[in-house]
Amino acid sequence: MQIEIKDGRSDNSPLPERKLVTLIQESYDSLKDDNEINLSTESTSNLLIKLVLEKLEKHSSLYKYIASVTTLNIEGLNEENANFSLKNDIGASWESKKDGIFNYKLEDKNSNECYLITILWLHK
């Protein structure tokens, strides 16, 4: 078994990278626009994961999907006061020709939050 360490692998994605970005952004926008969801009590990251996974499953049932969201509160951070550090590593055992990973950073300036989104797909 060959083990590879890479920053990301989206060239074999079930969707083009641009479509993945659009899917994530549309999912987030629909959360913000839904007046029935109280984002002060509901977990934005959990709702975002649910919407993204539902949309991915509609595109292809040939894959299993995993979505992860890391939420950063960036309120009060500026160029003089940017004293936080975040490191997230993930590993998987997969077939590199069929499986892959995509990372995306989504910022919401209105809520002072930043979402680091990771999507993995594993061919069934």
UniProtKB/Swiss-Prot annotation:
Name of protein: Topoisomerase I damage affected protein 2
Organism ancestry: Eukaryota, Fungi, Dikarya, Ascomycota, Saccharomycotina
UniProt entry tagged with the keyword Cytoplasm: yes
Major subcellular location class: cytoplasm
Family designation: Belongs to the TDA2 family.
Keyword Cytoplasm: yes
CDD domains for the chain: DLC-like_TDA2
InterPro entries associated with the record: Tctex-1-like_sf
Keywords: Cell projection, Cytoplasm
GO CC annotations on file: cell projection; cytoplasm
Compartments where found: Cytoplasm; Cell projection
